UniProtKB/Swiss-Prot annotation:
The keyword Transmembrane helix applies. Belongs to the sarcoglycan alpha/epsilon family. The lineage of its organism: Eukaryota, Metazoa, Chordata, Craniata, Vertebrata. The gene is SGCE. InterPro entries: Cadg, Sarcoglycan_alpha/epsilon, Sarcoglycan_C, Sarcoglycan_N. Glycans are attached at residue 200. This is Epsilon-sarcoglycan. Residues 339-437 are cytoplasmic. The keyword Mitochondrion does not apply.
Length: 437
């Protein structure tokens, strides 16, 4: 790299001393110089190239210690900085990552992980991932580029694939190289293949699983797909026998002879294992027969005329009004016939009614009419109960309780003894002394 002229001689405006013999830079120029050197070397080391294979699990760890060097040193000397750092990853020029690439970071104090399984469509196409690190204490950022060059695999895809569900692991724990290596070693002891690769890892939450409760160190669970070049072993085939299928339908653990080889570190749900044999799958792909690319001749195109004929809506208007009106008229005539022409009449009804019943109803009507007339006229003669009577004791004639001009509408239905002016007083029995006849 060819350095500029001012790099060799320094800033002439910042020289101190007399003459050109003492070329010493000021502190401000020294700081600018170091910052420029820091930026140049950061740019040089900002890009990383990785070469994963198609159909094989790709794991890239975003180490916090690596990105700490991109931020200024901790202000207090002698103290180790442990700033919270988060990462944002996206495909260059796009807001998100490719469909096959996933990212996870549990806390700002843990490393981030990019993982996924590239497909054959990505072979030969460099995929540039922009990685932006955020320092949550100083709010500073640093950006690196990860260039993924997908290489083609010789035996892609592997013909025999098995997917295991591990209940006691989270996805970030399973992505650790030593844990994944231990699992592949256990599978290799059971399967005995010549070639074994991890194809993909998926969290149980991405398959519709529930978030575990924060008790008893419960895990989310993870699906691990592996592929091999030899048929499945007899131990793996034990899951498909009817006895184990029945136990799985009853939510019971199946009996697997090789489970003890995994139980020391991995708790596998054998009811959720999936065995895929690519050699027995019938290809549904149909070859597309391409034609000449020439459309059949449909004749000369004739666009519609510019002058449109006027449409007469008079007939539509008549039909719209005439049909409902005719239906309404017919219904009206039927109703009028039923109400007017089908009545029996009073005379016919009386002829069919017995005489005794007519007399009974006539008396009731006569009494009702008389009571109504009496209620309307309050000036009629008083009943016989209000005429003058003799006093039961003295024999004197007592005038009526009410005069002729008394307003009977305000008269109470019942009167107390105090309201009666001519009430006879009955002597009370003496309680003290002697009584002689």
């Amino acid at each position: 790299m060819q350095l500029p002229r001012w790099w060799e001689l320094g800033d002439p405006c910042a020289w101190t001393g007399q003459g050109r013999g003492t070329r010493r830079m000021s502190p401000a120029t020294t700081g600018t110089f170091l910052l420029t050197v820091y930026s140049i070397f950061s740019k040089v080391h900002s890009d990383r190239n990785v070469y994963p294979s198609a159909g094989v699990l790709f794991v890239h760890v975003l180490e916090r210690e690596y990105f700490k060097g991109e931020f200024p040193p901790y202000p207090k000397p002698g103290e180790i900085s442990n700033d919270p750092i988060t990462f944002n990853t996206n495909l260059m020029g796009y807001p998100d990552r490719p469909g096959w690439l996933r990212y996870i970071q549990r806390t700002p104090y843990s490393d981030g992980v990019l993982y996924g399984s590239p497909t054959a469509e990505n072979v030969g196409k460099p995929t540039i991932i922009e990685i932006t690190a955020y320092n949550r204490r100083t709010f500073e950022t640093a950006r690196h580029n990860l260039i993924i060059n997908v290489m083609s695999a010789e035996d892609f895809p592997l013909p025999y694939q098995a997917e295991f569900f591990i209940k006691n692991m989270n996805v970030e724990e399973m992505l650790a190289s030593e844990v994944l290596g231990d699992f592949l070693g256990a599978v290799k002891n059971v399967w005995q293949p010549e070639r074994l690769n991890a194809i993909n890892i998926t969290s149980a939450l991405d398959r519709g699983g529930r978030v575990p409760l924060p008790i008893n160190d419960l895990k989310e669970g993870v699906y691990v797909m592996v592929g091999a070049d030899v048929p499945f072993s007899s131990c793996l085939r034990e899951v498909e026998n009817p006895q184990n299928q029945l136990r799985c339908s009853q939510e019971m653990e199946p009996v697997i002879t090789c489970d003890k080889k995994f139980r020391t570190q991995f708790y596998i749900d054998w009811c959720k294992i999936s065995l895929v044999d690519k050699t027995k799958q019938v290809s549904t792909y149909q070859e597309v027969i391409r034609g000449e690319g020439i459309l059949p001749d449909g004749g000369e195109y004739k666009p519609p005329s510019d002058s449109l004929k006027s449409r007469d809506y008079y007939t539509d208007f008549l039909i719209t009004l005439a049909v409902p009106s005719a239906v309404a008229l017919v219904l009206f005539l039927i109703l009028a016939y039923i109400m007017c022409c089908r009545r029996e009449g009073v005379e016919k009804r009386n002829m069919q009614t017995p005489d005794i019943q007519l007399v009974h109803h006539s008396a009731i009507q006569k009494s009702t009419k008389e009571l109504r007339d009496m209620s309307k006229n309050r000036e009629i003669a008083w009943p016989l109960s209000t005429l003058p009577v003799f006093h039961p004791v003295t024999g004197e004639m007592i005038p009526p309780l009410h005069t002729d001009n008394y307003d009977s509408t305000n008269m109470p239905l019942m009167q107390t003894q105090q309201n009666l002016p001519h009430q006879t007083q009955i002597p009370q029995q003496q309680t003290t002394g002697k009584w002689y006849p």
